[in-house]
Swiss-Prot record:
Region (Domain III, AAA+ region): 112-330
Keywords from the UniProt entry: ATP-binding, Cytoplasm, DNA replication, DNA-binding, Lipid-binding, Nucleotide-binding
Subunit structure: Oligomerizes as a right-handed, spiral filament on DNA at oriC.
Keyword Transcription: no
Example GO BP: DNA replication initiation
Family designation: Belongs to the DnaA family.
Cellular component per GO, a single term: plasma membrane
Binding-site residues for ATP, renumbered to this chain: 156, 158-160
Region named Domain I, interacts with DnaA modulators: 1-79
Name the record gives this protein: Chromosomal replication initiator protein DnaA
SUPFAM superfamilies associated with the record: P-loop containing nucleoside triphosphate hydrolases, TrpR-like
Protein purpose: Plays an essential role in the initiation and regulation of chromosomal replication. ATP-DnaA binds to the origin of replication (oriC) to initiate formation of the DNA replication initiation complex once per cell cycle. Binds the DnaA box (a 9 base pair repeat at the origin) and separates the double-stranded (ds)DNA. Forms a right-handed helical filament on oriC DNA; dsDNA binds to the exterior of the filament while single-stranded (ss)DNA is stabiized in the filament's interior.
Length: 453
């Protein structure tokens, strides 16, 4: 009987999906990971893969889908069964051997992957469609196209979600793949530890990072200024690339804007494809909230969703955090979620007019942060390229986004002559015409200075 039910399992799930109008996201999130573990005495034991769903979701699956599953099984098998659920991590030792990762690298990688960060739960919009398409292409054909894949964008916009999605997809398609996801901070810390224990660990460190199929390294900008880390990563990159292994990198800015990055690393980062993620527009923000509502099994009024999407515009993390805060306040006060409650929950996040006033100081703050300089250096007489170029970009943006005259901009930026400001603005305009991709840097900065609805 077990073999029959296993054979018919996909048919059972499809029947349930259609009969009870289960959405595609819920189907893939809660039902597809269920597997027939055992059948005995008219009881079917279904294993819940807690590496994908999470052990805390077991009660939800029981309450939501037990009766649906019993009905679907009876319809397809023509026999009544009771349903029990077991966590995959608690099943027999031999079952564990079959389902767990076959090597240390995979086990370690899985421990750092968020089970909810998959392509199925990633909301695609105009702000991220190229990054999503490139990530999926790399996941489907590692090291065949776009190597390396460089994903950049601001905090909380979905870079890490895409990287985890790539790792999950590759491991699902080929469980024997050696996939390693790390942050640049972890890479640096492990390098430091290997140097401290020079008798044993340098070889282990290199073996770990160079004997793999896919390397995903998050927030690469944090290796800036760390010469030894850049040196080690340079050789790691070369070894993997020459061996036709896939490399995926994320950062808060494109390679050409990481001014203190070694040129040899910058050029290698640009060998493949560079894609960006921008702040989501209103429609995408609504879709993100709807997806979170579904995944968290919530029921939220559309007016509340519209209120959040209209007022929280900066990034996905804050958007989802706002919804979580509203739901938490609702449970604490035992009140229904409505716009009045939402206003109370988000009063510290939303001012009556949350649109930023664009000032010269704000522009310089954003530009200096983007190019990893300080505001004092922008105002200073330092003429090195690492400082002068961001200064010229700040001048250009001040002219574009404020009503300040060239003379006023010059005075406020260290008593510079208006001709100096004009020269800086003209240089930036020429660079935009010469390198169209530079326009994207300007667009990113403008978004940071004053995000549009």
């Amino acid at each position: 009987m077990k073999s029959l039910i296993q054979e018919k399992w996909n048919e059972i799930l499809e029947f349930l999906k259609i009969e009870y109008n289960v959405t595609e996201v819920s189907y893939k999130t809660w039902l597809l990971p269920l597997k027939v573990y055992d059948v005995k005495d008219n009881v079917i034991k279904l294993s819940v893969d807690d590496t994908k769903i999470g052990a805390n979701s077991l009660d939800f699956i029981k309450n939501k889908y037990s009766q649906f599953l019993k009905t679907a099984i009876a319809e397809v098998i023509n026999q009544d069964f009771e349903i029990e659920f077991v966590l995959l991590s608690q099943t027999k030792a031999e079952e564990k051997v079959q389902t767990q990762a076959p090597n240390k690298i995979k086990n370690e990688s899985l421990s750092y992957l968020n089970p909810r960060y998959t392509f199925d739960t990633f909301v695609v919009g105009a702000n991220n469609n190229l990054a999503h398409a490139a990530s999926l292409a790399v996941a489907e054909s590692p090291a065949e196209i776009y190597n390396p894949l460089f994903i950049y964008g601001g905090v909380g916009l979905g870079k890490t979600h895409l990287m985890h999605s790539i790792a999950h997809y590759i491991l699902e398609q080929n469980p024997n793949s050696k996939v390693l996801y790390v942050t640049s901070e972890k890479f640096t810390n492990e390098l430091i530890e290997s140097i401290r224990n020079a008798d044993t660990t340098p070889t282990e460190f290199r073996e770990k990072y160079r004997n793999i199929d896919v390397l995903l390294i998050d927030d690469i900008q944090f290796i800036i200024g760390k010469e030894r880390t850049q040196e080690e990563f340079f050789h790691t990159f070369n070894t993997l690339h020459e061996s036709k292994k896939q490399i995926i990198i994320s950062s808060d800015k494109p390679p050409k804007d990481i001014l203190t990055l070694e040129e040899r690393l910058r050029s290698r980062f640009e060998w493949g494809l560079t894609v960006d993620i921008q702040s989501p527009d209103y429609e995408t923000r609504m879709a993100i909230l709807k997806k979170k509502e579904e995944l968290d099994c919530l029921t939220i009024d559309d007016e509340v969703m519209k209120y959040i999407a209209s007022n929280i515009k900066s990034n996905i993390r804050e958007l989802e955090g706002a919804l979580t805060k509203i739901v938490a306040l609702s449970r604490l006060k035992k009140k229904e979620v409505d716009v009045i409650l939402a206003e109370e929950a988000l009063k510290d996040l939303i001012s009556p007019d949350n649109k930023k006033t664009v000032t010269l100081d704000l522009i310089i703050e954003v530009v200096s942060e983007h190019f990893t300089t300080s505001t004092s250096e922008i105002y200073s007489d330092n003429r090195s390229r690492n400082i002068a170029y961001p200064r010229q970009i700040a001048m250009y943006l001040c002219r574009k986004l404020t009503s300040l005259s060239l003379t006023d901009i010059g005075k406020m930026m260290g008593n510079r002559d208006h001709s100096t400001v004009l020269h800086g603005c003209n240089k930036v305009e020429k660079d935009i015409k010469k390198d169209p991709s530079f326009q994207n840097t300007i667009d990113v900065l403008i978004k940071k200075i004053n995000p549009t609805p």
